Amino acid sequence: MRLNEFYTHSVCAPTRAAFLTGRYAFRTGSDWRSEDFGKPSYLAKLGLKLAHNDRGEPTRRIHALDTEERTVAEALQEAGYFTALLGKWHLGEWLPEHLPMGQGFEHQYGHYAWGIDYYTKTIVHNAPARFAVYDWHRNQKPAKEDGYATDLIAAEAERVIAARKNDDRPFFIYVAFNAVHGPLNPPPGFDGDPNDPMAIRHAMLKSLDQAVGRVSKAIDDNGFRDNTLFIFTNDNGPVLEELSKPFRGTKNTTFEGGVRQPAILRWPGHTKPGTSKDGLMFVADFFPTFITLAGGKHEQKRPIDGIDQTAWLFEDGESKRNEIAFDVSGSVRLPTIRVGEYKLMGDVLYNIRKDPSEQTDIAATHSDVVSKLRARVTSLGQERPPLGHKPLLMDPPLPYVYGSDEQKDVPPWLIEAVKEVRAKQPTEWAPGETPWPKAPKGAVASKMDGLKDELAK
């Protein structure tokens, strides 16, 4: 069953925070404070300066999901579920309490931060060599494994699912493939043009498709098909507008191409193959929906923005959601809200039902709608919590491996692996404000996202 109007935030960490907490990313500080890359020009864009520790050494702030947040993993653990996070975490990479096993996951495998090299398992950050760090772990200990990250995550999912036959508990397994996030590393056996980024992306996508098939098959082969809800979706749009068609925009924009995602659900007896549903759903809605399906407790200290969509998804009726706040003031993106058929992005208004490609600004002829939506998104922005106390800093400033406990006793093989990667990295930051790599050839970057297609010059 396909959801035709499923939405997320426009970048990865905010979406993951909303998925795990049922709350808009601005409430958890995840809408832009998910990671400090240490690039002065990028920090300046956020109104920050490069952090220094008490010894005067430049370092990075620790940004992570607040441990006071209740995650869906914790809620399902309370309901008696086995919980596992396989793949990308991106909600804290340093202190143990911020890592998956400190946030409700019994089993962890994969990487903590944002864009890992699929072969070396290092986070290079498109940054000076000193920032390269190893980021591949099993149960929060460094894992030395050869192979392509997408394949390794699929293999771990197969092992974890098979092991559930010896465990009477129901399970929640969050498989967060890094593909097709950069860097562009073609999978094994790639026979296309190594200088063609689109050919590499297509190969990475095919590899992802095969990996998802392996996970689905593992569920079926181990006898869990009929009582398992299997969901496939994404955390944000693509980096190229060409890949967003028919929608406009890219990742890191709140155009439809940045926030509208594919969403496929399979639950035999509850979803009908080949069908689709019209109606709004936001990624945070999975939080209360999962708790209802698991027979868990909805009561908690912090209110959620997610809406229980159990009845709409698996029974008759309509979606209960009529509003989505994609970004509010204080973000690096335009305040954007959708209410019903209308979406306001800054001063621009679109009727998404009539104009899903967002080609016609109707703000001038719908001033009443603009006023109403602006008042609403402004009101939500005023609910943003303060930054809080003095930020935590990463120490040592330039670790070999993510995870403060893992850095305390780094094995020789890991040090050598990181040194080898650092020897090939540039010594200084690339020009520009963003810490991300330049857009590949053929990119059509939106004016809103702050990125420049340097290759077009």
What are these language model-derived features?
Residues 1-4, 78-84, 103-106, 166-173, ...:
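Loop/turn elements at helix/coil->beta-strand transitions in domains of secreted/extracellular proteins
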Residues 106-107, 111-117, 238-243, 248-256, ...:
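C-terminal cap/loop subdomain of S1 sulfatases and analogous C-terminal strand-loop tails that border
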Residues 1-17, 22-27, 82-84, 103-112:
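Short, structured active-site-proximal loop/turn typified by the sulfatase FGly-forming signature C/S-X-P-X-R
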Residues 7-11, 59-70, 143-153, 196-211, ...:
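A short beta-strand-to-alpha-helix junction
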Residues 95-104, 183-188, 193-198, 217-270, ...:
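Histidine-centered active-site microenvironments of extracellular/periplasmic hydrolases
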Residues 35-82, 91-169, 177-188, 200:
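Formylglycine-dependent
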Residues 2, 286, 333, 339, ...:
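Long, internal low-complexity/basic segments
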Residues 12-22, 93-100, 120, 239-242:
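Pocket-flanking alpha-helical
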